[in-house]
A protein has these predicted regions:
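Hydrophobic alpha-helical segments of integral membrane proteins
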Residues: 24, 28, 32, 70, ...
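An internal, D/E-rich "acidic patch" concept
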Residues: 2-5, 12-24, 59, 81-137
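Helix-terminus/capping and membrane-interface signal
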Residues: 18, 34, 38-46, 120, ...
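Alpha-helical transmembrane segments of integral membrane proteins
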Residues: 24-26, 42, 118-151, 198-357
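Hydrophobic alpha-helical transmembrane segments of membrane transport/permease proteins
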Residues: 38-89, 178-218
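Hydrophobic alpha-helical membrane-insertion segments
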Residues: 39-44, 162-183, 288-292
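Transmembrane alpha-helical segments of polytopic membrane transport and secretion proteins
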Residues: 1-35, 147-148, 152, 347-357
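Cytoplasmic-entry segments and transmembrane alpha-helices of multi-pass inner-membrane transporters
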Residues: 23-32, 139-174, 282
Length: 357
């Protein structure tokens, strides 16, 4: 045996802590890589949309009566004279530095506009998903527990309406009934006009900002304006969550362990909520996450009907004004939020369900 072999230190395999750290580091690296690739794909899609839409971004800046020299100068300043690959790389670079361009509609940087309008959409969608979860999950459980009953049929009709009733129609009916006729809720907008501008924006969400400022009257006024559009969004979330909860519960109620529990005389309430409902909580997280992301991106018509100053209303105005920087910026933010919520729900799914790890 050589001297090198005698003095060489034995190589010991990593212990349980080292193996756990390596697995977690690999999982985090894979998650970040997937997130980066998905975001890059989103950038490519938004860039492609900006080139496919039959709107000339140069004309939206210089106007229809600009001379050819002014048009060409603006086109060169916007980098549209460069090859498509260079335009895409320039677009990615600007996005990564937070530069989404200037909005023609407002005259402000798009990133500043989005920071103003997104909190309103986030506030409405968050209350909407809370309503959807609070009502949709119990209704889905009850429908499955009483399969075939009149209550099950009624809940299924509600679920069908959530897929067939247009959001703008439901919003208009809600305004006509609960605001114009019954006066139970506030009208369009986030606040009554005499409350507007009385509190300094901190988070951009009026419910939180009014509480931070100690303005209880403004808080309740904001609630009266928020409850109807959030309920309209919550109805569509409720329909989807109730339908999926019912489907998950019916699958669990047909399992052998549920039948065994009933044969042993376990109370029906315990069978429903402990034996059947517990296993579906993890897949419900994915359903709720998808519904939440859908509310954030699908609130455009609701915001237009209720004159809600959110990102959906901002996107609609930008489209009507051919404001491509604002359109692409809003689309990018909505897509990024959708991706982020789906990734978070996927992480929660893996954390709560050991079989998915």
């Amino acid at each position: 045996m050589s001297l090198d072999q005698q003095t060489a230190a034995p190589i010991t395999p990593p212990g349980p802590a080292g193996r756990w750290f390596r697995r977690r580091a690999g999982a985090v690296a894979g998650f970040l890589l997937t997130l980066a690739v998905t975001f890059l794909g989103l950038l490519a899609i938004t860039f492609f949309i900006g080139r496919v839409i039959p709107i000339d971004p140069v004309l939206s800046v210089v106007g229809d009566r600009a001379t050819k020299e002014v048009y060409e100068a603006a086109r060169m300043a916007m980098g549209l004279d460069q090859p498509l690959v260079m335009q895409f790389l320039s677009y990615v670079g600007h996005v990564l530095t937070g530069d989404l361009g200037q909005s023609v509609s407002t005259g402000r940087p798009v990133i500043e506009d989005l920071s103003r309008f997104f909190p309103a959409t986030f506030e409405m969608a968050t209350l909407g998903i809370l309503i959807g979860v609070a009502l949709g999950v119990p209704l889905g459980v009850v429908a499955a527990a009483r399969q075939g009953s009149w209550l099950d049929q009624l809940i299924r009709v509600v679920g069908l309406m959530g897929y067939s009733v247009p959001a703008f129609w439901l919003g208009l009916v809600g305004l006509a009934l609960f605001y114009a006729r019954l006066r139970w809720v506030g009208g369009p907008g986030r606040l009554d006009i005499f409350y507007d501008g009385l509190i300094a924006p901190v988070t951009g969400m009026i419910l939180i900002d009014s509480l931070l400022a100690g303005e209880i009257d403004i808080f309740w006024n904001a609630v009266s304006h928020l409850v109807l559009p959030a309920s309209v969004l919550g109805f569509f979330s409720l329909a989807y969550i109730a339908r999926m909860t019912r489907s998950f519960m019916l699958d669990q109620l047909g399992q052998e362990f549920v039948t065994t529990a009933r044969v042993k005389g376990v109370p029906e309430r315990v069978v429903i909520w402990r034996h059947a409902f517990n296993p579906i909580r993890v897949p419900l997280i994915t359903v709720i996450g998808l519904s939440y992301a859908g509310l954030l991106e699908g609130s455009v018509m609701v915001e237009v009907v209720f004159s809600w100053p959110g990102i959906g209303n901002y996107l609609t105005t930008a489209l009507l004004n051919a404001d491509m920087n604002a359109v692409l910026g809003a689309t990018l933010v909505i897509g990024s939020v959708f991706i982020l919520i789906n990734k978070v729900s996927d992480v929660l799914y893996r954390v709560l369900d050991p079989r998915a790890r």
